[in-house]
């Protein structure tokens, strides 16, 4: 009996040792279940309705029809407050301190029929007397505005409501900038990136008209998008209580904004890296100086570790950061050429029992060579210079994780076939709505928002504006594929060039030590089995 027991234990130990030593450990893979609107509603007739809307935007309430959910906004003739003022030479804008509330009252009507044929005159699925504001920094000056609206109940209190099947909340965003002629950059990244990034906002296409007296003005195709906030169904971290020893918070790196609570951290104060952190949670009314100071202290510790010249200190960064989230953030943003990420609209959150995590994803209008003031180079990586990442990439363990994660995702949600199919199917789903939006805004786009021409690395002038929606989609797909193909061949050698030789690969060292220990166990198990067999 004992001999059989020893033999069994020996075999089991041998198998475990073999698996752990010879099977390469891969980074943890997290997949979030996420449905795509264009797949859920693929049977909708996307060719209904006109393809042309005049530049003035006026549409007939009796004739307008769309297969997309339809929002009707009515502000009863009110003007949106201009919350920014300009300097005398109009070179800079600053927030007007006299305007404390950017919202105006609005009636928000949603029409979303089961047959996917939505008319302005149809019975509404939902009507709310809430409030609305214009969103954005530079984008607030675009002719096609982006909006944020808040749902209210009959007493003027915030009302949580599910819209288009998304998690209930009172705060919603209508976005899709005039600068994205494909209409799908945000949708693509939120859907695909949301597969691996928890709390990434869901977004659903819709069309929007503004009621102006007895007339209706067509505003275009929009994405109804969840906001990034601490809430159930959003960034669902624990509710922080003042006496809690561990902190829960949501912060955002961006430009300095004195109208919201800003943090003073070691790196921002010393200007070691770009950007400032604002606090999104706890709310301003709950953010005491003590809590604010504790958050600043935690972040300063992380920054001092990352930017330390003492490698024994630097190597402890994994004690503070959810490293896998930073790996995924690098891969997604480099793949989609979103070089605003890490600088602007970059969110981080911390649950009381967990490490600091980067995410969720937000704001991709300018990704994939869609930045007006600069030409993206598909044969280059720019994310290596972003705050914190410029230090993380000095660690060979982090570089190894990034490259292996990229290789893994290229076989699934970042494969050429997956992305191209996603784009084609989304374009088919948008159908005539995409042409309506283009006819409404393309003239304004050409007048002041088209992508500037630049010389590429070979000295050739590149014109990035296309004459048709089909050509725009082709450029979109080509841009994705060209950069991905370059990453396939060059990501590892490029990132390896940033690795510091004096950074000991503690991860590899640990795995090597573990391998030796387990190899010994494996050999001992063989000896035990042989002894049992020989009867000793």
Task: Outline where the language-model segments fall.
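Hydrophobic secretory-pathway targeting helix
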Residues: 4-27
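Conserved oxyanion/phosphate-binding beta-strand-loop segments in alpha/beta enzyme cores
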Residues: 110, 116-176, 291-294
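Middle-to-C-terminal accessory/interaction subdomains
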Residues: 21-31, 81, 280-343, 349-522, ...
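Short, well-structured beta-strand/strand-turn elements
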Residues: 195-208, 338
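A conserved alpha-helical element in kinase catalytic cores
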Residues: 178-199
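Internal "kinase-insert"/substrate-recognition segments embedded within catalytic cores
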Residues: 155-156, 169, 196-201, 216-328
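N-terminal module-boundary/linker segments of secreted carbohydrate-active enzymes
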Residues: 25-117, 502
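Beta-rich nucleic-acid/ligand-interaction surfaces
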Residues: 205-217
